[in-house]
Amino acid sequence: MVIVKKISAIEVLDSRGNPTIKTKVELCDGSIGEAIVPSGASTGKREALELRDGGEAFGGKGVLKAIKNVNSMIAEEICGKDAYNQKAIDDAMLALDGTDNYSRIGANAVLGVSMAVARAAANSLNIPLYRYLGGANACTLPVPMFNIINGGAHANNSVDFQEFMIMPFGFSKFSNALRAATEVYQTLKKILNDLGHSTAVGDEGGFAPNLKDNEEPIKIIMEAIKKAGYKPGEQIKLALDVASSELYDGKTYQIEGKKLTSEELVDRYVKLCDKYPIFSIEDGLSEDDWDGWKILSEKLGDKIQLVGDDLFVTNEKILKEGIEKGIANAILIKPNQIGSVSQTMQTVRLAQRNGYRCVMSHRSGESEDSFIADFAVALNTGEIKTGATSRSERNAKYNRLLEIELETSEFLGDKI
């Protein structure tokens, strides 16, 4: 047992210049854990709720109210508890809030404490965070999903789909996969320059050119893979995050200036998958369109990975409903969608028990905190999504995975 001695939080800035919370936990043996909470741009309706200040400062996005909750009521509740009992600490914060979405004290307040406690406990034992959270079975480095062209809510351009990604499968080591993806990214930059497109980047480091439709980014990425010296489909596959809830009006989807039904949009996906080596589609339909998701799952569920992000919001109860209804076959894992380390772990375990793949994920508003890199290895998620290799808050996660590779070199690669 090691007792939580002190908890404190301050306001810092995330990668978009918005305020967020940095939390520090000190244990009675002198061990310290710190964590910075991320924040999303496109968010699911059923996510745990961040607490923001409102008012004029930072356009209403300040987090001083949440920080006050950390420094007062959460600190009073958690100090004196055993840091090694993560679930008891997380359960205590959930009970303190009294709601199922942290609308009282703020999911951002809770998550910062939860992450920092885990770090402090790992430091107390002098073991890596991934080993502390995952035990002896934490041994596999995830296949990264690199977001290299941005559209939708992550960029100010004409592309509807939010993310166009590459996944380097055909490599024996994580470091080799990272190198390949980086070379494709740099090649893509040159191609876009040669075509006269902007190489300005979006929130997650991907380029955000004004392209004519949602297929053109795929064509350009295919060209970049080949020009970089790699084989599409064999070594590097494609993935899409459509973020279709942003395109849905309750009945139809606004795609390239046209209104499409769920069936018509699914047919588009089928054609794209027939034409290109697409491994994964995330949020292919709206979180409110479960009938459409059923159609998508029936048509493509046995061929590609269908990831629920806004659909499941890392929520164990919602995922259970999806499993029962045969919706999707994978889940995006974002700790701040659900609010604590323990709740995140419970959702991952439910998914894995039922054959759903898990993708550990960043948010568009990130920081230098690399917690999710360790978390992906700890939970053997097999995949991680944390942006392009061009912004330091994204590279912090990749660099941490490179460090972990020195200790546990198994890479999922083409075994996924």
From Swiss-Prot:
Reactions listed under catalytic activity: (2R)-2-phosphoglycerate = phosphoenolpyruvate + H2O
Gene from which this protein is expressed: eno
Xref: PANTHER family: ENOLASE
A cellular component term, taken from the record's GO annotations: cell surface
SMART domains per the UniProt record, alphabetical: Enolase_C, Enolase_N
Cofactor(s) recorded in Swiss-Prot or TrEMBL: Mg(2+)
GO MF annotation terms: magnesium ion binding; phosphopyruvate hydratase activity
BP GO terms, sorted: glycolytic process
CDD domains reported for this sequence: enolase
SS bond partners: none
Name the record gives this protein: Enolase
Annotated family: Belongs to the enolase family.
UniProt EC number: 4.2.1.11
Role according to the record: Catalyzes the reversible conversion of 2-phosphoglycerate (2-PG) into phosphoenolpyruvate (PEP). It is essential for the degradation of carbohydrates via glycolysis.
Main location: cytoplasm
Binding site residues for Mg(2+): D241, E282, D309
InterPro entries linked: Enolase, Enolase-like_C_sf, Enolase-like_N, Enolase_C, Enolase_CS, Enolase_N
Active site per UniProt: E204 (proton donor), K334 (proton acceptor)
